[in-house]
């Protein structure tokens, strides 16, 4: 029952998260409330996404569970270091974008400008370094239970689906420039060409 509850929770979160991120929904809101109110949308979206994800973590931690595996030391220490490195990569990936725009603060004080395609730093290695870092952080967990494994699998599937739809959005937004970038740079794993 725990697995089903976690999967349904993440599915519901993913559907809401994806709907709120869609261009069609944002366009609908802009028509309904006007462009000026949309200046705070990115910040609202980020705060809502974070806060609405917390209730998913609660059942993972509190519902009946069983240990799947626990990696012994010293390998577990290396995995924890890997998680730390993944967290650093996540922060670097955000910093290599327009961080204030990414979190939604710049839009509060300035008129939103067309986004620029970031292809430097970590984005020279993979097209989605934030997803790569997130996947590394999840799967380098040295202790995994049935509940956490369920969350990791579902989150991984959601990340791949999200990357697919984000790619389509980026192709619409940047056209040939993104198509050329996509042809040169792997999606998630550096130096792996078939992505």
Specify the residue positions occupied by each region the protein language model found.
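Hydrophobic transmembrane alpha-helices
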Residues: 2-16, 112-195
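Interfacial segments of alpha-helical transmembrane regions
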Residues: 70-85
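Membrane-interface helix termini and inter-helical loops of multi-pass transporters
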Residues: 28-32, 61-73
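Juxtamembrane "helix exit" motif at the C-terminal ends of alpha-helical transmembrane segments
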Residues: 56-67, 141-144
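Core segments of transmembrane alpha-helices
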Residues: 46-60, 83-87, 124-137
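Loop-to-helix transition at the N-terminal end of transmembrane alpha-helices
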Residues: 31-48
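Transmembrane alpha-helical segments that form the membrane-embedded catalytic/substrate-channel core
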Residues: 9-23, 55, 83-105, 152-171
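Membrane-interface helix-loop junction between the first two transmembrane segments
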Residues: 18-36
